[in-house]
Every structure is written in C-alpha cells, then in structure tokens.
Amino acid sequence: MTQHPTQSPQFFLTAPSPCPYLDGQFERKVFTHLVGDKASEMNDLLTQGGFRRSQNIAYRPACETCRACVSVRILAQEFTASRNMKRVLQHNSDLVGAMHNAEPSTEQYSLFRSYLDARHRRGGMSDMTVLDYAMMVEDTHVDTKVIEYRRRGPDTFITGKGQGELIAVALTDKMADGLSMVYSYFNPEFEERSLGTFMILDHIARARAMGLPHVYLGYWVNGSRKMNYKMRFMPQEHLGPKGWERYTNEAVSR
C-alpha cells in the first residue's frame, strides 16, 4: 500500500512521568513534529494555542488530573517597567545583545554548562553534552535566533555588538505576533545583575521595536516558586478555556 505524506500534523501523547514543578503530580505531554516548509506557520499557530518548542518538537501539557500549567504572554506594547525593573536596566546598561542565526559555539556551551552546574545541577538538562546543546540550538525549522549579551565596546554604536566575555544568551523564536523565549541562561557569578529579568526586559524592548505585540514566556505554574518571576511582567495574558484573556493580580509585587 502506498503512503502519501500529509500536511496535517500528527500528535502523540507521552507516558506519565513525575512533574518537575509540583510534588506528587505526574505530567503527560501531547507533541508533534515541526518540519517542512510550513514549520514556522505551524509553530506560530501552536504557540498561540499554548504549545512550546524544543528543537523540532512542539508540545503542551496534557495531564489527566491537573491544569496548573498556564501559557503566559506579555503585552509588550503596553508594558511599563517598574522601579525595580528600571534599576535592573540601569545596572545592566553596560551590556548589549547581538542577534545571530541559530548557530552554537563552544563559548556558548561553556557558559551553558556553568549555568546548569550552578543553578540546575539536578535538573533534566544537567547531563547535556556539547552535541546535545548543539542540537538544542540548531535543530530548528523555524525562525530561531541566538541573542548573545556582552559588555559594550567602543564600536558598539556602529556594529551593535559587544566585546569581551559572553555574559548571557537567549534562544528565541521570532513569530508573526511576537517573540517566544525558548531558553535563556547566564553567568551565575553575576547573580546581582538579575540577568534573567534583564533578558526578558530586553525582549520586550525588541518586540516593541519590531512592532510585535507579544513576548511569550512559556508556562506559569501556580504554586511553583520557580515560576513566580513571570507574574512581575504586567500587563499580560493567560490562555484559558475561552482563549487568551488579560490577567490582573493586584497582589503581584512590582
């Protein structure tokens, strides 16, 4: 029997595994492959529907008894930085981010390795090799960019690039309606710089400059302390049963 390729994506369901965010819970994911000349268009649609990308896979939670994972996107054009965020921007005013094609480097992997060893030694990515990292960056069929952050140099105004050591990196998908932050990491020795916050603020500024309405942050998990930082970037929308809806929480500390 002859089989013909189909343009419609095929979806698969993973087996249950321990949830990395909530103790005692088990997670399942539904996923599909992002390949071919329609990969970018499909990634846009799936991201708007609550999926995340990892290499050439788009996935979203499909847990049987839990709905704690909520897709979050910042309304970039309406965003106003808080006083604390303005201090973060000022503290990092000596840094500049240069956007490159999705190409890995040994310098990136060295920084990535230092970040994991300091912050996520027991995480699911802790045993990634240099080849694993290269696949994470370059195994993409969508418009993926790597943003490298370094200190400003005398030629930065002309070149748009920094100089010296690599301080932080963001792996980002450029979509029709926004920027999706796939993964980011930084030099753990510069914890006082709040580089995670800085990179999100930088993505908001980039989205605004590009005329894009959203910055996608992935999932917020109510009850997970490691996810609380996402609630600081207001206004934002959450994806629920009725679609994307504006979220407000007066208790969020700004």
Curated annotation (Swiss-Prot):
Primary gene name: bpt
Protein EC: 2.3.2.29
Subcellular location: Cytoplasm
Root EC class: transferase
PANTHER family, per the entry: ARGININE-TRNA-PROTEIN TRANSFERASE 1, ARGINYL-TRNA--PROTEIN TRANSFERASE 1
GO cellular component, one term: cytoplasm
Biological function: Functions in the N-end rule pathway of protein degradation where it conjugates Leu from its aminoacyl-tRNA to the N-termini of proteins containing an N-terminal aspartate or glutamate.
Any one of the GO BP annotations: ubiquitin-dependent protein catabolic process via the N-end rule pathway
Record bears the keyword Transferase: yes
Catalyzed reactions per annotation: N-terminal L-glutamyl-[protein] + L-leucyl-tRNA(Leu) = N-terminal L-leucyl-L-glutamyl-[protein] + tRNA(Leu) + H(+); N-terminal L-aspartyl-[protein] + L-leucyl-tRNA(Leu) = N-terminal L-leucyl-L-aspartyl-[protein] + tRNA(Leu) + H(+)
Keywords for this protein: Acyltransferase, Cytoplasm, Transferase
Keyword Acyltransferase set for record: yes
UniProt-listed HAMAP family: Bpt
GO terms of molecular function: arginyl-tRNA--protein transferase activity; leucyl-tRNA--protein transferase activity
Protein name: Aspartate/glutamate leucyltransferase
Protein family per UniProt: Belongs to the R-transferase family. Bpt subfamily.
Pfam families the UniProt entry points to: ATE_C, ATE_N
Matching SUPFAM superfamilies: Acyl-CoA N-acyltransferases (Nat)
